[in-house]
Swiss-Prot record:
Keywords: Aminoacyl-tRNA synthetase, ATP-binding, Cytoplasm, Ligase, Nucleotide-binding, Protein biosynthesis. InterPro entries: DALR_anticod-bd (IPR008909), Gly-tRNA-synth_bsu (IPR015944), Gly-tRNA-synth_heterodimer (IPR006194). The gene is glyS. This is Glycine--tRNA ligase beta subunit. It is an enzyme of class 6 (ligase). It holds the Pfam family tRNA_synt_2f. GO terms for biological process: arginyl-tRNA aminoacylation; glycyl-tRNA aminoacylation. It catalyses: tRNA(Gly) + glycine + ATP = glycyl-tRNA(Gly) + AMP + diphosphate. Coiled coil: none annotated. It comes from Agrobacterium fabrum (strain C58 / ATCC 33970).
């Protein structure tokens, strides 16, 4: 079956856009072909900095013939209805329609419309221009003669003004080939703003800029590689990672791996060449995180460390070039080294300035007094400055200083709940946001918290306070580590709860896929801390909003489900007012263990049967009594069940009060045999109305007994 090869070659595409753009191209093209009746066996997208490529295998040579029946009006319909039918069906005369008889509806017209299949070449040429013109780039531009004002022309190309092609960077050539796997392929001709699709591509911009004639995908890939272009981005990543590790190892070093940077640099080169640069060892006095970010952000280079070292860095870095230089890369290394040293010099300047005094300490005394700050210490000065400048946190939620004051009050209440030292918690809170006014964080915002910790250690803060300054931002996702120290746990909870309560108060809640303030992440962080650090916190005591509590419930469900818990078991123990998430999780754990055992499964069946019978009666308007009359218990099975319910209810309630949910489940398991015996021997719908009502009350007692730990009616299976 025929294959299709499409290449869109342009100036350099930003690395961050390449992978998604290639995926978009695949989806848009394959969807358009399938929509027009062309199926295929497989498709794969490729990308380099200068091209998007699509390889579609096993594409039908033509679309299938289609036979449609279009139902029309009755044969005795008025002329206007018949004319409308003819127009819609594309018929010239009613004699071209067929008449069908229906015993109920009478005779009516139908039109048989036969649509012959079309050659794939025709369909491809038809869909490509529209796909390219409407391509969903995040940012795009107009370029070339076609972007000139309408009415003007250049080199035979007419200006189209705003109607000209928008592409991420100037589009230079298009390859579009279709044909059998082994025979000659043909060019599918179409034109985009003077660019004619053909069979010519070009290799590496510097090493092999000449034209390459393409026949099919295999020789396209091999000829590009001869022309110093590796088409497969994942292969470029593998080459970069392998060669970088080897080069580091050869110099007695280890590569500090960075998946995000690896993805980016693989999108900056078509022919990756791995080189090593150096900088002066004096710069190693700067924190390793600043060095890594400086080199990564400004030069897209990897850092290294000594072999076997867990911390610290070496003074050598790995750079990736797109040129196989004749001098072995000496000039490239020299040029990158100059820039790296200049950037590290700036970083050292930030680092040193952040440890010095601010020039306007007199103006900070009021803020210092408000937060009990010591203006002899650099980090305290930065916190005072943050407050004095009235830096806005959110237009409706006040300044950063006001936010810290709120977190301070909340943390004061949370400290005894967590078991943290109140004085250390207070000190950690007032310094937690101070590094937002440091120059290092101003240059690299992703270092907030971490730099605060380093500056706190330098000014002699307690180890728990320093750790809390960094860790109060954690966890920042489902796999991020949690704060370990109790002081850090307290500040992290206070920070996240203040954010959530505040945004709920101003009605800035997540909607659909939109969550600009990362409130879902904050709520999940609270859930993880409470459950994984065994913190008992009644959320309604701090988040006095039922809707916010419901939001926590949703995050809890997601978290527990990811751990393997069943949704129905979570729902069975969760009530709208449940605000102790740790206890909810423990109930789910105990219920899961109980329900997977034989006693649990059988009791569940009996309890659900009782609930269904009660629901049917209550639907009829029957009012079921709250208590059971022992004198109306006539049969041994119902007497035994009532005695078992009284014992099990008392034992389960006592266990729940002691938060021993496994024992509560064990107490309920004793009901299994009496419930089974009751349904075997007892007819609930007795002829005697009083006995019947009493037996319904007994069923209600079963429901209430099991309800001490869960709502069994919500459990499936």
């Amino acid at each position: 079956m025929p294959d299709l090869l499409l290449e869109l070659r342009s100036e350099e595409i930003p690395a961050r856009m390449q992978r998604k753009a290639a995926g978009d191209l695949k989806k848009l093209v394959t969807d358009a072909l399938v929509e027009r009746g062309l199926t295929y066996e497989g498709a794969r997208e490729y990308w380099t900095p200068r091209r998007l490529t699509l390889d579609i295998r096993g594409l039908n040579a033509r679309s299938a013939d289609v036979r449609e029946e279009k139902k029309g009006p009755r044969t005795d319909a008025n002329e206007k209805a018949i004319e409308g039918f003819l127009r819609g069906a594309g018929l010239n005369d009613i004699s071209e329609a067929q008449v069908v008889s229906d015993p109920k509806k009478g005779d009516f017209y139908i039109a048989i419309i036969n649509k012959p299949g079309r050659p794939a070449e025709e369909i491809i040429a038809e869909v490509m221009p529209g796909i390219i013109r409407s391509f969903p780039w995040p940012k795009s531009m107009r370029s070339g003669p076609a972007s000139m004002p309408k009415g003007s022309s250049y080199a035979g190309i007419e200006g189209k003004g705003s109607e000209s092609l928008r592409w991420v960077r100037p589009l230079q050539s298009i390859v579009c080939l279709f044909g059998p796997e082994h025979d000659e392929t043909q060019v599918i001709p179409f034109v985009i703003d003077g660019i004619v699709a053909g069979n010519i591509t070009y290799g590496h911009r510097f090493h092999a800029p000449g034209p390459i004639t393409v026949r099919r995908f295999e020789d396209y890939v091999s000829n590009l590689e001869k022309a110093k272009v590796i088409l497969d981005a994942d292969r470029r990543k593998d080459i970069i990672l392998h060669d970088a590790k080897d080069l580091a190892f050869a110099n007695g070093l280890e590569l500090v791996e960075d998946e995000g940077l690896l993805e980016e640099v693989s999108g900056l080169v078509e022919w990756p060449q791995v080189l090593m640069g150096t900088f002066e060892e004096d710069y190693l006095q700067i924190p390793a995180e600043i060095i890594r970010l400086t080199i990564k952000t400004n030069q897209k280079c990897f850092v290294t460390r000594n072999q076997g070292a867990e911390e610290g860095l070496s003074n050598r870095f790995i750079l990736i070039s797109n040129i196989e230089a004749s001098d072995g890369g000496k000039e490239i290394i020299h040029g990158n080294g100059k820039v790296v040293r200049a950037r590290l010099s700036d970083a050292r300047h930030f680092w040193n300035r952040d440890q010095g005094d601010l020039p306007d300490l007199e103006t900070l005394k009021d803020s210092a007094a408000k937060f009990d700050l010591d203006l002899k210490k650099p980090l305290d000065q930065r916190m005072a400055k943050l407050d004095a400048l009235n830096v806005t946190f959110h237009a409706k939620l006040g300044t950063q200083g006001e936010r810290v004051a709120r977190i301070r009050e909340l943390a004061k209440a949370l400290a005894p709940v967590v078991g943290a030292d109140g004085a250390l918690v207070d000190r950690a809170v007032v310094l937690a946001k101070a590094d937002l006014r440091t120059e290092a964080v101003g240059e690299f915002p992703e270092l907030q918290g971490l730099m605060g910790r380093k500056y706190a250690v330098l000014q002699g803060e307690n180890e728990s306070v320093a750790a809390a300054i960094e860790d109060h931002y954690k966890p920042q996702g489902p796999s991020d580590r949690l704060p370990a120290d109790k002081v850090a746990i307290t500040v992290a909870l206070a920070d996240k709860l203040d954010t959530l309560v505040g945004f709920w108060a101003i009605d800035e809640k997540p909607t659909g896929s939109k969550d600009p303030f990362a409130l879902r992440r904050a709520a999940l962080g609270v859930v993880r801390i409470l459950l994984e650090k065994n913190v008992r916190l009644p959320l309604l005591s701090v988040a006095r909003d039922s809707d916010l509590l419901s939001f926590f419930h949703d995050r809890l469900k997601v978290y527990l489900r990811d751990l393997g818990a069943r949704y129905d078991l979570i729902d069975a123990v969760l009530t709208p007012e449940s605000d102790d998430l740790l206890m909810i999780a423990r109930r789910v754990e105990a219920l899961t263990a109980f329900i997977t055992g034989e006693d649990g499964r059988n009791l569940l069946a009996g309890a659900k049967r009782a609930t269904q019978l009660l629901a049917a009666e209550e639907k009829k308007g029957t009012v079921v009594a709250d208590g059971v009359s022992e004198e109306l218990l006539k049969l041994d099975a119902e007497k035994a069940l009532y005695a078992a319910i009284k014992t099990a209810s008392a034992d389960a309630a006592k266990a729940v009060e002691g938060e021993d949910f496994r024992s509560a489940m064990q107490a309920l398991s004793t009901l299994r045999a009496p419930v089974d015996k009751f349904f075997e021997d007892v007819l609930v719908n007795d002829e005697d109305a009083a006995i019947r009502a009493n037996r319904l009350a007994l069923l209600k007692a079963i429901r209430e007994a099991t309800g001490t730990v869960a709502d069994f009616s919500k459990i499936t299976g």
